[in-house]
From Swiss-Prot:
It comes from Salmonella typhimurium (strain LT2 / SGSC1412 / ATCC 700720). The complex is composed of two ATP-binding proteins (CysA), two transmembrane proteins (CysT and CysW) and a solute-binding protein (CysP). One of its GO terms (molecular function) is ABC-type thiosulfate transporter activity. It comes from the Bacteria. The keyword Ribonucleoprotein does not apply. GO terms for cellular component: ATP-binding cassette (ABC) transporter complex. Part of the ABC transporter complex CysAWTP involved in sulfate/thiosulfate import. Responsible for energy coupling to the transport system. Residues 3-237 form the ABC transporter domain. This is Sulfate/thiosulfate import ATP-binding protein CysA. Its main location: membrane. Belongs to the ABC transporter superfamily. Sulfate/tungstate importer (TC 3.A.1.6) family. It is a peripheral membrane protein. GO terms for biological process: sulfate transmembrane transport.
């Protein structure tokens, strides 16, 4: 079932928490709402579920406006971060609960409920724990019970609010893989909230990055990493090096070094330069691609590559994090050379286009 979010705004008193949000989610897609605390991601999820009401705008499921429908009428499954299991009920009864409280005309027979719950217990690999109570379960087991309970009523849309946030790292990884496999099998439309970049990019078909009530970028996970649409996305998604400097003519001035850009940007003045660790050119010998001297202050072998922290020698004050391929690990104190050719330049939040981008803009004008 598709979800259409059309010009949603939400205020709490004088505080605007969602600013004219629009997003289309095709049927069967798994979408991550990713952002820091206060970005509006959980509020948006709750509005989709009907647990909060928007100040303006519309929510449509498969073309039908559900904006005024109560949460129970929207027929979505919702999984909370802290499980929200009934402590006095067994695992079996927790999963069955949603079926037992359906209106009489929609309620399955006791035999059908038993069959359904048994199938769900097998699916979430907890059949042997059917008679246990929540207090007797691990965090990962509780989350599986919560997910099975949400799936019991056969929702066409599944919503999850930081479903793995309360679990330890190893259990989170296992449950992420399991949820992705389950999604592939059942093909339900799913939206989940997370602040974990790795979780979002590993599980979701599409990542929606949010900040201060706005959507910064909605894209495939790899594109969000490699082609960030805004400065916020660039800085939020993983580690990035930032250097401050100035563009003058066709050169970038950083500290005591002048680095030729190979073209003269339309913008001239102060800029911030950004490179992810793997975008920094690095070698043991100086060259046109790697002219800037650095000294290794930390080296962390990672198998087929080494993550380095290097200190620029005479041309910048802050250390950089870089990645060097190969098994020949540099040692602390070793002198290397880096290049910044793959950098992105920003003036505040405004991206400074490369020569190719400026030419493309001129041709399209």
């Amino acid at each position: 079932m598709s979800i259409e979010i059309a010009r949603i705004k939400k205020s709490f008193g004088r505080t605007q928490v969602l600013n004219d949000i629009s997003l289309d989610i095709p049927s069967g897609q798994m979408v991550a709402l990713l952002g820091p605390s206060g970005s509006g991601k959980t509020t948006l999820l709750r509005i989709i579920a009907g647990l909060e009401h928007q100040s303006s705008g519309h929510i449509r499921f498969h073309g039908t406006d559900v904006s005024r429908l109560h949460a129970r009428e929207r027929k979505v499954g919702f999984v909370f971060q802290h499980y929200a299991l009934f402590r006095h009920m067994t695992v079996f009864d927790n999963i069955a609960f949603g079926l037992t409280v359906l209106p009489r005309r929609d309620r399955p027979t006791a035999a059908a409920i038993k069959t359904k719950v048994t199938q769900l217990l097998e699916m979430v690999q907890l059949a042997h724990l059917a008679d246990r109570f929540p207090a007797q379960l691990s965090g990962g087991q509780k989350q599986r019970v919560a997910l099975a309970r949400a799936l019991a009523v056969e929702p066409q849309i599944l919503l999850l609010d930081e479903p793995f946030g309360a679990l330890d790292a190893q259990v989170r990884k296992e449950l992420r893989r399991w949820l992705r496999q389950l999604h592939e099998e059942l093909k339900f439309t799913s939206v989940f909230v997370t602040h974990d970049q790795e979780e979002a990019t590993e599980v979701a078909d599409r990542v929606v990055v949010m900040s201060q009530g706005n959507i910064e970028q909605a894209d495939a996970p790899d594109r969000v990493w490699r082609e960030p649409a805004t400065r916020f996305v660039l800085e939020f998604m993983g580690e990035v090096n930032r250097l401050t400097g100035t563009v003058r003519g066709g050169q970038f001035h950083v500290g005591a070094h002048r680095w030729p850009l190979g073209y003269t940007p339309a913008y001239q003045g102060p800029v911030d330069l950004f490179l992810r660790p793997w975008e920094v050119d690095i070698s043991r010998r100086t060259s046109l691609d790697s002219p800037l001297p650095v000294q290794v202050i930390e080296a962390s072998p990672k198998g087929h590559y080494t993550q380095l922290v290097v200190q620029p020698l005479g041309w910048y004050h802050d250390p950089l994090t870089v990645v060097m391929a190969g098994e020949d690990v540099p040692v602390r104190g070793e002198r290397l050379f880096v290049g910044l050719q793959k950098a992105r330049l920003y003036n505040g939040d405004q991206r400074i286009e490369t020569r190719e981008e400026e030419l493309a803009l001129a041709q399209s004008a």
